[in-house]
Every structure is written in C-alpha cells, then in structure tokens.
C-alpha cells in the first residue's frame, strides 16, 4: 500500500518579500525573479508523480500553483485555511515601520508568544489550528496518495514545528526559501523526507541559498 505523502511548497518571490514587508493576508505581485522561480518549479513538478494539488487562495500562492498545474494538468483546489498568518495592523509594513508606528504593540508581538493575537489579526496558535484543520481534512480525503499544497512561509513553519515536536514559542527557525519544497511521509507519524529543497532553482539566474 502506498504511503500518504504531503508536499508543502512556499509561493514564489513577491515584491514585498524583497522589501521585507509583512504580507500576511494581503498580496503583492510576484517579482520577475518570482516568475522565473514558479516557471522552474512547474517544469520540475512535471517529473514528480503526485495525485492532488491544493493552494492558498492568495494571489501569490494561486499563481505559483497555476504554474504547476500548467505543466501537470492537475485540478487546482483553493482553500483559504492555507493563507498566511493574518498580521493585522502590521500588514504592509516593514518591521522598522511597525516598531515606529506601534511601539508597544510591536514589542508585545515580538515577546508575548504563540497565543498573542495581533490587533485585527490572529495568533500563531490560531494559524496552526486552521492550517492543521486543512491538512488533516486533505489527508482524510486522499489517504495513500501524494498531495501537493502551495502555501506560505508562516504556514510551513508552524506545520514543521508541529511535525518535529518543536514548541511554537521556540525561536527555532527553518530556511523556507521561495518555492522551497518540504516533503512529509505518514508512517504512523509524520516523517520529514525533504526539508526546504530547491533543486528546480539551479538553472534560475542569480539564485543562491
């Protein structure tokens, strides 16, 4: 019997990524580099056997998933539970701008932990709960299949911490590159088979890890 496999992929590079702006539930356009990344990803995924394709309903994730669908022909399923963390009043700002505009709130945001709910936004714990809700539903729908999920850095981070048993409040970080690939295999528990690989970017100009 085949394993149940989940392939998490972060979206391509956006303008706000390059400006270090907090995107959250908002969107910004893919950069020319991001467009190159998703094209390379799509071509690469053409050679990767998988059964189902899901993505966040944000434009950056949708465009990235569409680049895969273009080469593979899979139906695309959008799920708003796979969105990036809602960063509320900080969305669209750099960390420096947020610190200057909301000094007390920004300090709380940085120190209060995973249960802290940003004004007009959500907590990291809430992000994990809705992301897990989506992933568990996908796995129940498609047991013993390979499912690709195009999502966001924050979603990948909390899911990987959950899988690895790392507390959400831990400062542990992972390199989650744009279009980075994380492969999980279910064998009574999640096994990490790939951690942020970007083999498809070897031919993209100026790319370096």
Per-range role (PLM):
Residues 1-5, 88-99, 140-145, 161-209:
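Acidic, low-complexity terminal tails and accessory targeting/binding regions
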Residues 11, 152:
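Short, conserved phosphate/pyrophosphate- and ester-handling motifs at nucleotide-, phospho-/glycolipid
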Residues 13-74, 78, 122:
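Active-site-proximal alpha-helix that buttresses catalytic centers in soluble enzyme cores
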Residues 14, 155-156:
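Short active-site segment of divalent metal-dependent hydrolases/proteases
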Residues 29, 70-130, 185, 191-195, ...:
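Phosphate-handling substructures
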Residues 55-56, 129, 150-151:
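Short beta-strand scaffold positions
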Residues 67, 158-162:
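Active-site signature of alpha/beta-hydrolase-fold catalytic machinery across serine-
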């Amino acid at each position: 019997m085949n394993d149940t496999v989940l392939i998490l992929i972060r979206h391509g590079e956006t303008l706000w990524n390059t400006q270090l702006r907090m995107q959250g539930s908002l969107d910004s356009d893919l950069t020319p580099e991001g467009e190159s990344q998703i094209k390379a990803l799509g071509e690469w995924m053409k050679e990767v056997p998988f059964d189902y394709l899901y993505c966040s309903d944000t434009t950056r994730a949708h465009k990235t998933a569409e680049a895969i669908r273009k080469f593979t022909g899979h139906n695309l399923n959008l799920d708003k539970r796979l969105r990036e963390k809602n960063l509320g009043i900080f969305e669209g700002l750099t960390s420096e701008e947020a610190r200057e505009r909301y000094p007390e709130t920004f300090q709380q945001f940085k120190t209060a932990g995973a249960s802290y709910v940003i004004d007009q936004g959500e907590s990291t714990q809430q992000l994990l709960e809705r992301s897990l809700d989506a992933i568990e539903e996908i796995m129940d729908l498609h047991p013993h299949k390979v499912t690709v999920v195009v999502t966001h850095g924050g979603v990948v981070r909390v899911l990987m911490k959950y899988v690895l048993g790392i507390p959400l409040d831990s400062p542990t970080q992972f390199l989650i590159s744009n279009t980075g690939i994380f492969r999980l295999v279910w064998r009574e528990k999640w096994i990490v088979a790939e951690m942020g690989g970007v083999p498809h970017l070897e031919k993209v100009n100026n790319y370096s890890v």
